[in-house]
């Protein structure tokens, strides 16, 4: 039985406003639709500023190397080299100070957003907004192997949170607006509105509720329109004249996806255990970690500049350049290791784009082997590179639909939908069989354990719990739900109709259960609504 002992003005206000929203469900969804447009505008403008600063900082880094540092190295002039090293140290100190000022702005930002949506973490939206834009552009621009997608998703999310706080919305509505902001963030980062919308549904909320779909769809489309006004309609990757892969090569696709599924497990393992490298006896402060990573970037700028930054230009080069196998393996190893070093230092930036680049390099290595063995024509090398990207993403993130749509939109070629979906499925199944954890779930749990100060205080929030077919909650009466204190079932939505909760009411697949509870209790019910009853 659920406790009916509820008191307090905060709880009463949540109940009243939520009842109002649920009783006027169609008006509530229309309001979310309109608010999604404003979230998309705010997120699109913020991310456009972030992308502009990032592009300028990367151009400045390239200019410094080719105009100053490389010529100085050739003439044995140490002054410019020492000056650049001091600049990197100063940048490291500044990034550390900003991360100390806004701890939730460090790292990718996606686990943090997910934690806030689940009601497990809290964000100070205005502080994170400017720190993420500035620190992300500086760190990635200085050469760290980090991506713009994580910061963009968090920037969009805090834009949605800011709108919610400005308008005084309930926590339930705020979660929808944060989700729509995250959707806008991914869409604006890569000109990929479909992937942005699907990421919010598949990864963040893990259900296809209409209340989630409407604001995420409008915000993703609006944010994409805004960013295209500044950066044009071009795709992130530029593959020219892709030839569709014949059906007889599908077993190659399965083999490549299987290998990339294994690579995804290895990538996740490295990302979760890079902390052992940054041992506290050697790296006593976060500043020392960031400075070390930046100095590594400074050295790699002379040796392997291809692995610096996100790496989308490297993917374009792989499609048109026949690199030797040894050099491809060197690039793969260097990109993987430097991505771990960059992410592990805690500087603001994601691993989404570096993950795709590592997948592209893995695909390039496999394509080289297949072509040299006479098993595949060289004309299909770009196809294998794309398959490597989508497979590694599906294995690591465990969001195969998002990965498929993202690569399709980033390449601008939808003729490969079937092949990419097939590869995503194989890689996903491989990772599931090997019992690898989805990377963002693992990072969220680690963040909650390592930084309890960022966790939410136990407050009552309205949570939407979808009931999946075959789940632990399907066909259960309300009276048989697990006992939880301070929890109230407010309403059940079934086929668009509202049902008043009754102890004898049985839950059906497709129902949406609206409960007012502490976040951790609600998360337990959400897992039961998703997990299969088959053991």
Predicted regions and their residues:
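Short glycine-/aliphatic-rich beta-strand segments at the starts of folded cytosolic domains
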Residues: 459-467
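Alpha-helical transmembrane segments and immediately membrane-proximal extracytoplasmic
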Residues: 1-452, 469, 494-496, 510-513, ...
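A structural signal for short secondary-structure junctions
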Residues: 385-386, 396-397, 457-459, 482-484, ...
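Cytosolic Rossmann-like ligand/nucleotide-binding regulatory domains
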Residues: 468-525, 529
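Interdomain regulatory linker/hinge segments that flank or connect interaction modules
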Residues: 450-460
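A short, polar/charged loop/turn motif at coil->beta-strand junctions and beta-hairpin connectors
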Residues: 107, 134, 459, 483-486
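A common structural junction motif
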Residues: 530-535
